[in-house]
Each structure stands twice: as C-alpha cells, then as structure tokens.
C-alpha cells in the first residue's frame, strides 16, 4: 500500500494493502476498501462506505458524504460500491437515509465524470455512464448500462430502465422505459437506443421484439394498461420484453411518453 505522508487514514478504516492513497486524501474511520483501489489527491472517502476492488477516485471527489436531505438526522446509513468504477474530479456520492432504505448502492464498471452527483438512496446498476455535471436526485433507480449526457438531471424517485439513454441537458421527471432515449429540457421521448442495444450484444431478433413493444406502447392510441395487456399477450416469454413489461407495470411516477 502506498499512502502519501500527507494523507489521513483515520483509525478504524480497513484499507487493503494494495490500495494507493494520494496527497492530502482523507479516508474516514468507517470506510472499507477492497484491493486495488486508488484515491487521488485531496479526495475524501467517508461515512460507512464500502468499496470493492479496483475503483479509481480522482482528486477532490467526495465519496460517502452525508445526504443533502433536510430530514437526515445523522442516522447510521451506508454507501456500497462495487468494482472497477471511476469517479472523476469533484464527483460526489452520498450515503443513504433511514427513510430511503439506508443504503446508496452503485454497481460495477461505471464512469462518473467530473462534477457529477449521485444523491442519497440511489440504486445504480452496472456499467453506468454519468457524464459531466449530471445531477441525480435522491431515491433514483438507474438500471444496468444507462447513459446520462452532460448537464442532465433526474427528479427524485424516478426510474431509468436498462440501456436507456438520456441526452445532454435533459430533465427527467418521469420514469424512462428500458431501451429508450429521452432528450430535451422536459425529457421527451426520442426513440429507441438501437446503437446501445447492438453494442450490448442483443441479437436482431431481440432488438426486433423491443421495437414491436415500443410501437405498441408509444406509437399506438392505447392507454398504458391496454398496451401492457397487449404486450403480455403478444411478446411475453422473452427476457428483453419481459423486463420491459415488468418495468412498465412497476411505475409509480408514470412513463415518459
């Protein structure tokens, strides 16, 4: 382990010997860090934060800070981060709150660009790409392989489905269905993330079924309940469309249409 002489690793922190801690970095007493993590100059990892392996935290990032929530009263909450994530300069990720389950979670293989923010109680899947200055409010669910363009934002409690793409400077105020693209100041539906599906290795048949589902929900005159019923009748039994159907049925805020 390489700990710079100016870094502070507080008593109680459990840091794997293979980690690198840069100049003036601060590691709090409740932090648990697995092998191969690196923490850059002036970065802070604090709170009850657990990191897996091979995460990179760049200078001035703050990982595990207390929630930006007026209801937070200092309760013991946590942040759990997987493996191989990158948190660029000034990125912030907050702990959970008692009112939101107590744990903020981030999967593996994500890129959180400079000045991006992940709020309290968010659940972020694998392979997220969160671009510069993106603001994700509390309690947001982001499924696997979601992309947020720069300067975009999500309202609290929204859900963004697998392989969705949120364009730059977009405000998300309702759920974004899996495989879909939204863009514009008010987060309007802009089609399917076909390139993302192809890059994820989905077959032509799978992409074709998603296109059928998209047309039923978003390009017909059916109400959402009627569209879901038609999806279940015509496209159930395939993982990609089963997930699409389950996501629609689980929406509390409504679907971006």
Curated annotation (Swiss-Prot):
It catalyses: a (3R)-hydroxyacyl-[ACP] + UDP-N-acetyl-alpha-D-glucosamine = a UDP-3-O-[(3R)-3-hydroxyacyl]-N-acetyl-alpha-D-glucosamine + holo-[ACP]. The keyword Lipid biosynthesis applies. One of its GO terms (cellular component) is membrane. GO terms for biological process: lipid A biosynthetic process. Keywords: Acyltransferase, Cytoplasm, Lipid A biosynthesis, Lipid biosynthesis, Lipid metabolism, Repeat, Transferase. Involved in the biosynthesis of lipid A, a phosphorylated glycolipid that anchors the lipopolysaccharide to the outer membrane of the cell. NCBIfam families: lipid_A_lpxA (TIGR01852), PRK05289.1 (NF003657). This is Acyl-[acyl-carrier-protein]--UDP-N-acetylglucosamine O-acyltransferase. It comes from Anaeromyxobacter dehalogenans (strain 2CP-C). The lineage of its organism: Bacteria, Pseudomonadati, Myxococcota, Myxococcia, Myxococcales.
């Amino acid at each position: 382990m390489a700990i710079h002489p100016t870094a502070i690793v507080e008593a109680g922190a459990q840091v794997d010997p293979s980690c690198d801690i840069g100049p003036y970095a601060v590691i709090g007493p409740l932090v648990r860090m697995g092998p191969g993590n690196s923490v850059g100059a002036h970065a802070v990892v604090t709170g009850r934060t657990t990191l897996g392996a091979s995460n990179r935290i760049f200078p001035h990032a703050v990982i595990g800070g207390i929630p930006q929530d007026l209801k937070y009263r200092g309760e013991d909450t946590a942040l759990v981060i997987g493996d191989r994530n990158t948190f660029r300069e000034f990125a912030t990720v907050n702990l959970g709150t008692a009112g939101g389950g107590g744990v903020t979670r981030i999967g593996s293989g994500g890129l959180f660009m400079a000045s991006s923010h992940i709020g309290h109680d968010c659940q972020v899947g694998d392979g997220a790409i969160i671009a510069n200055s993106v603001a994700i409010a509390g309690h947001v669910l982001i499924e696997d392989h979601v992309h947020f363009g720069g300067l975009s934002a999500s309202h609290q409690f929204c859900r963004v489905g697998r392989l969705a793409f949120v364009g730059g400077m977009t405000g998300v105020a309702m759920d974004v269905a899996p495989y879909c693209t939204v863009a514009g100041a008010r987060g309007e539906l802009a089609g399917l993330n076909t390139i993302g599906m192809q890059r994820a290795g989905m077959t032509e048949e799978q992409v074709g079924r998603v296109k059928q589902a998209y047309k039923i929900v978003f390009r017909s005159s059916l109400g959402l309940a009627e569209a879901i019923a038609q999806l279940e009748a015509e496209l159930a039994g395939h993982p990609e469309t089963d997930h699409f159907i389950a996501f629609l049925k689980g929406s509390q805020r409504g679907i971006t249409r």
